[in-house]
Amino acid sequence: MFDNILEQQRIEKAKELKNLGINPYPHFLEKEMSLKTFKDKFSYILEQVEKRDESVNAVVAGRLKLLRIAGKSIFANIEDEDTNLQIYFSKDSVGEELYTILKKNLEVGDIVLVKGFPFVTKTGEFSLHASEVKLATKAIVPLPEKYHGLTDIEQRYRKRYVDMIMNVEVRKDFLVRSKVVSLIRHFFENKGFLEVETPMMHPIAGGANAKPFVTFHNSLGVERFLRIAPELYLKRLIVGGFEAVFEINRCFRNEGMDLTHNPEFTTIEFYWAYHNYKDLMDLTEELFALLLDKLNLGKTIEFDGKMINFSKPFERITYKDALCKYGGLDRDLIEDKEKILTKLKADGFEANEKLELGHLQAELFDNYVEEKLINPTFVIDFPISISPLSRRSDEDSQIAERFELFICGRELANGFNELNDPLDQYERFLKQIEAKNAGDEEACEMDEDFVNALGYGMPPTAGQGIGIDRLVMLLTNKKSIRDVILFPAMRPLKSELKEKE
């Protein structure tokens, strides 16, 4: 650990500082203000003749990003969470003894606490003239080379802390993410929704069609499943008497990783008694309008080279109409299982003959429609067979009162009128078991306790989930989900695998 020559040199400097009575890792160093506050508060000197105010004695802190020694003085650039600032100090300003120590031991990457006044250099740069410079933290590992930075994408994800040090834009993206979550939370609170927390470990893998992570509870001696979705617990709360609830939290799916999938991801799910899925679509449009406004993005934004128009209302189109309009498929084909199988095979797609019509229509949708839905589009009235928790349409028993929101070829939200008929729900679970036996690994398990909860009576309810990660990708114009997750899942390095062996 820390065994290369540059790291060893820095360790020696840390030891030298200790020998001089200077702790390279001190505590209780308190800064007065951020660098942004310093710039804003003292910008008035730019309008003055002398362009300095020596009556100020402000304390700031930051990481050294640049260091330039010019004879008896040092110019440095420090950076904190928000911005950067040039600092200047010399033998005269900090004293010859301290200056000599700093000149020898300060390095790029170190964190310093600086006290001084604002001034403008001869080259016109707003700066801080330091009277005191204290080492706050000695960095042992050198930062990547300035002009090339940390450009290897794998290293950026594996060492996010270095990525954040070197790339200001990365920090800004995660500030946006934090703001998005905060805005969503306040949006639902202002609508009268109650924020709740439900279990992360489930006795049954349910709430969505996906493959779960399995763990074991030693004390109870039973398997547990990291939650795929919180849906069934949130609906139990509606049964219990709450009428509007939401949860922002992690979900886990033991599936592949790609540009839009990470094994653990963040969602918001919300359930609203005495409302329907049309109300949810209206609410979703309102939420997007709020986010775009608060993030100063306007009604049209760019994502992956495409311009997306968020003007209301969003397009609403039935599942089957989307297959025809965007997929270019004939109406008679999408209603015929054999024709669908022939079409899929002819175009080189996998086609499981055991799947029923609704699942095959979903194969058509995934392969011919989804990527063509660029502007916000609500696809409504899904096949009932792929909607095991949705209410069945009164007008067509093969259709679920369900929608998904697609933007730029990606699903962003899924919502529906909740199935509250316990007998129908029980039969749907049985169908899911049949699907699992036919080879569908993602089919839901039977959850008799949930069916029993419905037996006590759940009021007419609409529920929806929105993927926070994909939403942030959209709002920050990021192509990969790993760009909006602080510490995304990564394949183990060969060295890590060898250690386990």
From Swiss-Prot:
Top-rank taxon, per record: Bacteria
One protein family per Pfam: tRNA-synt_2
GO CC, alphabetical: cytosol
GO terms, molecular function: ATP binding; lysine-tRNA ligase activity; magnesium ion binding; tRNA binding
UniProt-listed InterPro entries: Aa-tRNA-synt_II (IPR004364), aa-tRNA-synth_II (IPR006195), aa-tRNA-synth_II/BPL/LPL (IPR045864), Lys-tRNA-ligase_II (IPR002313), Lys-tRNA-ligase_II_N (IPR044136), Lys-tRNA-synth_II_C (IPR018149), NA-bd_OB-fold (IPR012340), NA-bd_OB_tRNA (IPR004365)
Enzyme Commission number: 6.1.1.6
Cofactors demanded by this protein: Mg(2+)
Residue numbers binding Mg(2+) 2: 411
Ligand binding (Mg(2+) 1): 404, 411
This protein's UniProt keywords: Aminoacyl-tRNA synthetase, ATP-binding, Cytoplasm, Ligase, Magnesium, Metal-binding, Nucleotide-binding, Protein biosynthesis
NCBIfam families: lysS_bact, PRK00484.1
Family classification: Belongs to the class-II aminoacyl-tRNA synthetase family.
Protein name: Lysine--tRNA ligase
